[in-house]
């Protein structure tokens, strides 16, 4: 038997996960008396599109997109003076969350969620059409915003569950370290072999 139900991203208000990722395998494991491990280890993508949670990929920041707070001032230099928007995901996600929690975010009235802006307006047509067409397309499709003329709302979005049902490197479920359950496997986000670390 293989458990492969995905993670539990739907417990978060903003997630990149599909609606089916509700932690079903985790619940089944707990009900069967099996342990879970490292459930606090959750990766957040820094720039999820407000509402659907879809990723606005790192590419938008790599090509020159700027994160801005409520007063439209950029803020990443405060958290990563040299790398700014190109800092590692976890640092950018924490910086955005800090700005929001300290009152410098913007409330999106349609979704009742606070966010910051990603500013892509200054990017050339070539960049918008060739280098980041999917990002521009997502903002148009899900938010009815044109990144050439509008600031776009983003916030950290639950992305990947590192913890889950303990397995060995073959995916066999472990009742305790070194003790596997014959014929029971966990794969993907519902399992945890500690390959990914905590982020």
Language-model features: where?
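Short helix/loop capping segments that flank catalytic or ligand/cofactor-binding pockets
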Residues: 11-13, 75-78, 85-86, 127-128, ...
């Amino acid at each position: 038997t293989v458990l492969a139900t995905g993670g539990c991203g739907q417990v978060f208000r903003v997630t990149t996960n599909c609606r089916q990722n509700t932690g079903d395998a985790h619940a089944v494991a707990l009900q069967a008396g099996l342990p879970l491990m490292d459930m606090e280890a959750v990766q957040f993508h820094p720039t999820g599109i407000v509402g659907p949670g879809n990723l606005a990929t790192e590419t938008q920041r790599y090509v020159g997109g700027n994160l801005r707070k409520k007063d439209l001032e950029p803020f990443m230099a405060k958290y990563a003076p040299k790398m700014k928007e190109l800092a590692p995901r976890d640092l950018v996600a924490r910086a955005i969350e800090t700005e929001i929690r300290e009152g410098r975010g913007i409330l999106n009235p349609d979704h009742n969620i606070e966010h910051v802006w990603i500013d892509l307006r200054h990017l050339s047509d070539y960049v918008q059409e060739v280098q980041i067409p999917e990002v521009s397309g997502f903002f148009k499709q899900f938010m009815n915003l044109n990144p050439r003329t509008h600031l776009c709302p983003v916030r950290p979005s639950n992305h990947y569950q590192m913890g889950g049902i303990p397995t060995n490197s073959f995916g066999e479920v472990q009742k305790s370290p070194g003790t596997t359950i014959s014929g029971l496997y966990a794969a993907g986000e519902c399992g945890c072999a500690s390959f990914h670390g905590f982020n």
